[in-house]
Every structure is written in structure tokens, then in C-alpha cells.
Amino acid sequence: MKIKYMGHSAFIIEHKNRLIIDPYIETIPEVDYVLVTHAHNDHFGNTIEIAKKNNAKVISIYEIAEFVKQFNIESIGMNFGGTIDIGEKVSLVPAVHSSTLYYNGKAYPLGNPGGFVIKGNKTIYHAGDTMVFKDMELIGELFKIDVALLPIGGVFTMDIDQALKAIDLLKPKIVIPMHYNTWPIIKADPYEFKRKAEEKGVEAIVLNKDEEIDL
């Protein structure tokens, strides 16, 4: 599996399919599926444009999946505990946050926020926007996480210290920070996070925008 960081909380995961998660990006990459953790605009991003350009399916919580159908986009709605097999197994798990889309001057509350676990030859957990919560321990037990993508910017999500606690609960082999330094309000030092994570014996990788790793 390959992971490419697209900035903020956006990643492209490549295995049998090419998946993009939370596409708050300026480009329209070639993908097969668009995964949306929640409806906030810095995660929903240009989901509509990417899905239409690629004839890609949107995978998200049921309410978001239903919302995009008005744009003639195919979608797969899920809820917590659900798993689908698209060549990779995609599971929707909880997050502790909120989820409202602001679109064309209107506010659309669109279900609960979540995270995704994607299983190919490795297992990747994208936490979405969240604080640390005790059930991360259960997510780790159920899925045996190889790589955890964790927000560290604080204010709207967990900060570095909470993300370090999330490592204790999830027990991943590798962690990659996200959702930081996009704006001054979520300023954080990813290398502080890397140093402290590695003091726990967990490999931490700081990816620059457009940088890719092969697992």
C-alpha cells in the first residue's frame, strides 16, 4: 500500500484501488473512491468535483452519502461498525467532533463524524477530526493498526499530548501527523510529535505535502 499526503487531512491511499480521504485540496487527482470522514468544509473539500471528474464513488456516513446523490454522484453510505469490501476493506469508526457542511449559503448537518480503517496488505487508520477517546483502544484491538493518521493541531481536534495518548490506546506500528499548520490557529510542531512518539518506541513519519511512502 502507498500513502501520499495531500496536505491538511487529505491522503491518497493506493492498493488495488486509489482512494482519497478528506480532499480539501486544489487539484483534481485521478481516484476510484472519495472517502469523507465528516461534513466540515476543510474535509468535504472538493469531493463533488473529484467524484464527478473521475466517476468515482463517495464513501461516507449515510447522511453525506445521500447528500451527494443530488449531484448525480454514486455513493456508498455506511455507519459505525460497518465494513465494505471494495478490493480493500473499508470500516467506519467513531470520532468525537461535529459535522455540518456549509454549501451555497446553507448549513447542512450531515450525520455523525467518523474515521476510517482501510485494510489491504497493511491496515491504515485515518482518525478524522477528533479528540482522544477511550474507544480508540477498542479500534486498536479490533483492527491491529499498522499506520495511524492522527490530528495534532489542537483547538478543533486533539493536540500533540492527546495524540500521544491516542498512540497508547491504538498501539500502531507507525504514526503520521495531520491537521496542523494549515492556519495559525492550529499551529503545531510535527517534529515535537515525532520525537515524543519515538520515545514511546513507535515510528513516526512527518510527510511533506505531495510526499509518498510505500508500505
UniProtKB/Swiss-Prot annotation:
Keyword terms of this UniProt record: Hydrolase
A Pfam family per the record: Lactamase_B_2
GO MF term set: hydrolase activity
InterPro entries assigned: Metallo-B-lactamas, RibonucZ/Hydroxyglut_hydro, UPF0173, UPF0173_UPF0282_UlaG_hydrolase
Stated family: Belongs to the UPF0173 family.
NCBIfam families per record: PRK00685.1
Name of the protein this chain belongs to: UPF0173 metal-dependent hydrolase NEQ378
The organism of origin for this protein: Nanoarchaeum equitans (strain Kin4-M)
